[in-house]
């Protein structure tokens, strides 16, 4: 190597190391009483706050997070959306990458800040996401994004302003909230023999209220046609906006268990008790960044499907699940539990105070949520603006509906990656058919026809360290194995299992890699290969510009119509990765599967501090 070449190498290494820095964080997890919606219950605090602190890093930073468990129960922390390339021991999934952190103990997570974008972190121990351990993550990118912003505006000042706005966004962690802890909530379902999913509030950045607008008002807020299409004539919601818990359309079946709706405590399904508290306020400055502001939304919901809008303001959706997309302009958007969205808003309206409407848009409950976007200096102004959504999330006009993002409609969910990134065409190397639904009880969920993923699966012998522990056992039905360097298709079928022909959506999240949704259609999957399905139903597939995400929604099916989806990904990140529904009740009920990606290139050099024996 010449002297000049060596000099260039030294310079390159210097700047690489100068850019990537080591960032150390400390998270102390405690359990105490709080009242984020004005009604007291016990919940999880992180460093004394709820929700957990926002963590901001630069791409490729070396991250070290020490988690101290100061509760009387187990905990882990999952870094949702981070690929954990070469660090599968830091994914934070009990039974796969680690043992749970016992009370009084600590665990140190080490990983690269990658990929850039909007992510989040949360507990992955049983249903404890319900209890409040979640916070936003922002990884600021190295690269230039001029090509992204130029799709929104060709003005050079605007492009620079949007880059600056995206570098320092507003963070909105949106969560649903119940008066019951996760353990209490799950016990209500198992005691009553009914899947219970009624909530009390929608919170934004840990703030919200309990609204009781009256049963007649809530009945009028039902999505048009929902009762007629899905439920018996005359079905009415409760004064909390919830459907009757014992409806066959909700509970499925028949199941060989006894339904005991009388064991559902008061105020779970009905008996609304209002509380005034406070809603989150987002102060924005139109004098900064040429009037552009970026907002990062995290759907830290456990059951609800969230819709958001800002009165009188359109927005450009430019990032989903930490992956940049070709921007599109909307006035409202629907987020599924687990997803993250980033939007760019032009502050071009009359300075004032504008309502942010953030209701539950799912068919589970009519439930409103609110925050305020306030132009700086207008904190004392009266609210102004045009509403795009009603209390229950219905569009206020046909134009609003035309300009809204719906993940279950392929014509609006055509959010292709930027820069272009598409999967291999033709057949994959491996195909796995996963049949989703309920088995045996309304709260038991499977991903492979019959097996339920236990919440303590392999907790003592995590699969990262014991990848063959389930072989020759019935539990091997909970494990998929793939080869490194292969293209894999995951085919998800819903609404075909006995007793589960009426199926609510599932929000399917894969750890360790993003997937392209290349196909979506109605009916029963009865093809010998994806390639055969493409030949027979080309209109149901897209391999040129499919979306790329880590969380996808399956179809809502009431009335027996089956649906399937096809997700494709490339195996280049060996490790044990959980693939599961991000609705906490469904995961607690068994809707998960362990995917051991790259078993032929399994991590061999695991740092000694992470070894278990």
UniProtKB/Swiss-Prot annotation:
Its main location: other. Binds 4 Cu cations per monomer. Cu cation 1 binds at residues 78, 509. GO terms for cellular component: cell surface. The keyword Ribosomal protein does not apply. Cu cation 3 binds at residues 124, 511, 580. CDD domains: CuRO_1_Abr2_like, CuRO_2_Abr2_like, CuRO_3_Abr2_like. It is found in: Cell surface. Glycans are attached at residues 74, 256, 279, 444, 468, 484, 526. Pathway: Pigment biosynthesis. Cu cation 2 binds at residues 80, 122, 582. Residues 29-142, 171-359, 468-598 form the Plastocyanin-like domain. Laccase; part of the Pks1 gene cluster that mediates the biosynthesis of an anthraquinone derivative pigment that contributes to conidial pigmentation that provides protection from UV radiation, heat and cold stress. The polyketide synthase Pks1 produces 1-acetyl-2,4,6,8-tetrahydroxy-9,10-anthraquinone though condensation of acetyl-CoA with malonyl-CoA. The dehydratase EthD and the laccase Mlac1 further convert the anthraquinone derivative into the final conidial pigment. This is Laccase 1. The gene is Mlac1.
